[in-house]
A protein has these predicted regions:
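Active-site anion-handling motifs in enzyme catalytic cores
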Residues: 1-348
Length: 348
């Protein structure tokens, strides 16, 4: 039997559908390879501060320690406690981790960078979700890096009738990042207004219906504001079930999202995407999937460029979907190769 302890974002953000999608997808893929299999969830923040001896002893009772995915290479999770990392005796696997830095925020400190270096030196296997993060690690002297894509790309879907869609209309999913980010105080309300105006145009121009794809509880504030502006929209909120949200993403004809995992779930569902970026990770992932020209910096976003990029993306839907299918097949091959490497660790 293979026993895995998996540290990722859980306690604070487990109501964030993207974080749930990451955790469940990694768990499910490991379960399919490591049979029989036991799984112990851990909170990533437990690795940041000194812990009693029993904490590390519990980790070392397992066969493998998985850390990730998500944007763990960021100021929010670093530095990790060096003594804990050095005391982990079982193989460490870094799974699909990404670099995260809000637009307008500071670079990582040297202490945080050294923590990343230590973590990767101690790891038996390192994987990242995009090419930028791979380049970042290689610049730190970490050479053996597997680029596998975000784990949540491969999340299964579960049918749901939570949102009843009109088959006669073009279905556009939208998402606004309403948790705190560096430029949030200045740009949140302007971007809600610009989104609303762009959606009004798309409703009339494309005969579209708008579906708000809620990733975080705070986003219901966005829905409330948009409805006060008389924007007709349906709301999908499947938390804490990410499988159902993935199903709804697959029903969309276009997604205009801000949250990182709005982009990930759309790509995983084969749905064309426009991204309004508030973080470097948005650019990095969209470039990784060949869609960098579909990114709008939140500082420059207005109804006109949201409309322009949305129409351009929608008009090219056939080619985008074809390219997404091909890239997803390639990434699944990489994912399987990485899972095979993990399975060999459990038998050594």
């Amino acid at each position: 039997m293979s026993s895995v302890i998996h540290f990722c974002r859980r306690e604070e953000d487990f109501y964030n559908i993207g974080e749930i999608a990451i955790a469940y997808s990694i768990r499910d893929m490991l379960r399919s390879r490591l049979k029989p299999f036991t799984y112990t969830p851990g909170e990533i923040k437990e690795l940041e501060n000194p812990q009693p001896t029993e904490f590390v002893e519990t980790i070392n009772q397992h066969d493998i320690c998985v850390i990730g995915g998500g944007g763990l290479y960021s100021k929010f999770f670093l530095p990790m406690n060096a003594q804990i990392i050095k005391s982990i005796e079982i193989p460490i696997v870094l799974y699909g981790i990404g670099y995260l830095r809000n637009l307008g925020d500071n670079e990582l400190t040297q202490e945080q960078i050294e923590s990343i270096r230590l973590l990767n030196v101690r790891a038996k296997l390192t994987s990242v979700r995009d090419e930028y993060t791979c380049k970042f690690l290689r610049n730190l002297g970490i050479s053996d890096v597997h680029v596998i894509g975000d784990p949540a790309i491969f999340l299964d879907s579960e049918e749901t009738s939570q949102v009843v869609l009109d088959d006669s209309k073009i279905k556009i999913g939208i998402n606004v990042a309403c948790h705190y980010w560096a430029l949030y105080p200045k740009y949140l309300y302007p971007i809600i207004d610009e989104y609303t105006k762009a959606c009004e145009f798309l409703i009339n121009h494309l005969n579209a219906e708008i579906v708000y794809l809620a990733h975080h509880p705070d986003e219901h504030h966005v829905v409330e504001i948009m409805r006060k502006k008389k924007l007709p929209l349906k709301v999908a909120d499947t938390s804490p079930n990410p499988y159902k949200m993935k199903f709804i993403y697959g029903k969309m004809d276009l997604v205009i999202g801000m949250m990182m995992h709005s982009t990930v779930l759309a790509f995983g569902s084969g749905t064309p995407i426009v991204n309004v970026a508030y973080d470097a990770k948005n650019y990095n992932f969209m470039e990784f999937i060949g869609q960098k020209d579909k990114v709008i910096d939140v500082r420059n976003a207005d109804q006109e460029n949201i409309k322009e990029v949305s129409l351009r993306t929608f008009d090219d839907s056939k080619n985008i979907k074809r390219d997404f299918r091909a890239l997803k097949r390639e990434l699944w091959t990489r994912q399987e190769e990485f899972l095979t490497k993990i399975s060999k660790l459990s038998t050594n």
